Amino acid sequence: MRPETQSAVTQLDSTLTTIEKVMNPEDLESRVRELEQQASDPTLWDDPDTAQKVTTELSSVQAKLKKLSTLRQRIDDLPVMYELADEEGEDALALADEELAELTADVEALEVKTMLSGEYDSREAVINIRSGAGGVDAADWAEMLMRMYIRWAEKNDHKVDIYDISYAEEAGIKSATFVVHGEYMYGQLSVEQGAHRLVRISPFDNQGRRQTSFAEIEVLPVVEQTDHIDIPDSEVRVDVYRSSGPGGQSVNTTDSAVRLTHIPTGIVVTCQNEKSQIQNKASAMRVLQAKLLERKRQEERAELDALGAGGNASWGNQMRSYVLHPYQMVKDLRTNYEVNDPQKVLDGDIDGLLEAGIRWRMAEQQGQN
């Protein structure tokens, strides 16, 4: 085995050992036994919500154990793979190098997940996108970002539910709200919060001038019962209207779309993509709860800041630039992480940006402690 390859394998083994210490397979196995015992209780499904939580956690913990076991086996197999490759020639060596590269990426991805230890990091994510300065280009840019996140979710086998889209008159969207389902979606996607800037030749300008557009991304954790975000009916005004599509045309002959206004705060949430008014109201209420939870968290952070013990709640502002002209580059202004192929990013290849953002956030938090 080449010295540089031996060094890479040794480093990989060391990284996984550190991950194993953090995740603690013995504790995970113990938790599996506890959950399996709960799942075998015939009365469990008398409470469907509790049953769902138990089965979901059981699947999650089992998946973590399987991931650790698989990665450990692959690392242990690498020296043998290279030993055989030395005997078989260049083609076998190329396959071994490919396995090393893929394994390194898999271990690094798991390492990043161990950094997601915040109170809400394991939750699903609500994403709100709003077009900003830039007119029709900004509306088009907001729609491009929505497509980017949905593509990323689909590539990673995460279901997306679109709750609401407000279409702009000429092209694009004014705003959109959707939920990305799956464990740790909030922890991963929360680093996307802030202003995203696009620089390109405007397809809507007859003179082909360069245009700068902005869109704002808000990422919220999905609220659970344990958060105790109770909203009295008296504090919510409910308005119903007909769903609309691009250009403002009605797409529903009944008043199924719902707008909720939280009277004490003035927060407004709409949902029109479900099939019925009841479903739209339930989805809108979930988003309203998420917004109120975030408001509560911001107030708590502001109190800590006043005591000199907290960070900046607006860390994500002006966080990334996507330049399509006069050169091609996506650059995160917090991490300095760069990608020279913007189209790949816009097609949902944002794992590198997310990982860099998570590492940056951890370093920021450690610097404040």
From Swiss-Prot:
Its main location: cytoplasm. It holds the Pfam family PCRF. Peptide chain release factor 2 directs the termination of translation in response to the peptide chain termination codons UGA and UAA. Keywords: Cytoplasm, Methylation, Protein biosynthesis. HAMAP family: Rel_fac_2. One of its GO terms (cellular component) is cytoplasm. It is found in: Cytoplasm. One of its GO terms (molecular function) is translation release factor activity, codon specific. The gene is prfB. The modification N5-methylglutamine is found at residue 249. Belongs to the prokaryotic/mitochondrial release factor family. NCBIfam families: prfB. This is Peptide chain release factor 2.
